[in-house]
């Protein structure tokens, strides 16, 4: 209802400000291929992203298993609730909303993801994604095949540590959000 619309409107303003801060616009990916680095070492989001603290060897290994699909236009799904889990994703530009529908068909927003943030982790340990992931703006992403990523762990402990740290941060942020909601409800 109204809360969801206001939240999306506020999020879109945040995205516009974030994209402006990074100098990002969807046309950069279509008309300026030099900004569309095909490896983590050359990516303009490097310092805001998962590979930020990786050494060159680990960053190269991660780059080799990262796909760069064409940008998703506003409203397009990156994946749908209950679709087979295959990859985790990092936003390069735009914004992604994750949400699910309950048994009654009511939508529940679970997150908004901005450039440099990881999503798709809702499928880890399962065979399918729990949520829908939808582009709210023209959105470019990096897709990391999760099975291949797991196969790198024994050889690149640093990658495993960074992914684990990112997952822990995501859990912490969700806990903080729940605490904030509970505090607001109590007031």
How would you describe each model-predicted region?
Residues 11-74, 118-119, 123-124, 155:
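Cyclic nucleotide-binding regulatory module and flanking cytosolic helices
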Residues 75, 86-99, 115-116:
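Glycine- and acidic-residue-biased ligand/ion/polar-headgroup-sensing regions
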Residues 179-186:
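N-terminal positioning helix adjacent to the helix-turn-helix/winged-helix DNA-binding module
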Residues 97-108:
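A short beta-strand-loop-beta hairpin characteristic of the jelly-roll/cupin
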Residues 109-173:
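Cyclic-nucleotide recognition modules
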Residues 78-83:
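Short phosphate-coordinating micro-motif centered on Lys-Gly-acidic
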């Amino acid at each position: 209802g109204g809360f969801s619309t206001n939240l999306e409107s506020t999020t879109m303003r945040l995205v516009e400000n974030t994209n402006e801060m990074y100098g990002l616009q969807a046309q950069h990916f279509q008309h300026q291929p030099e900004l569309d680095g095909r490896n983590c070492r050359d990516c303009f989001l490097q310092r805001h992203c998962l590979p930020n603290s990786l050494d060159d060897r680990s960053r190269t290994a991660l780059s080799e298993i990262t796909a760069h699909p064409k940008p998703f236009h506003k409203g397009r799904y990156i994946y749908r609730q209950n679709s087979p889990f295959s990859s985790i994703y990092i936003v390069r530009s735009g914004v992604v909303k994750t949400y699910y529908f309950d048994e009654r068909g009511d939508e529940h927003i679970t997150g908004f993801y901005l450039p440099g943030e990881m999503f798709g982790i809702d499928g880890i340990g399962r065979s399918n994604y729990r949520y829908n992931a939808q582009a709210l703006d023209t959105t470019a992403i990096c897709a990391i095949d999760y099975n291949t990523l797991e196969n790198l762990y024994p050889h690149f402990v640093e990658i495993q540590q960074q992914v684990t740290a990112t997952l822990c941060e995501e859990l912490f942020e969700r806990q903080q959000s729940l605490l904030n909601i509970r505090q607001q409800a109590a007031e």
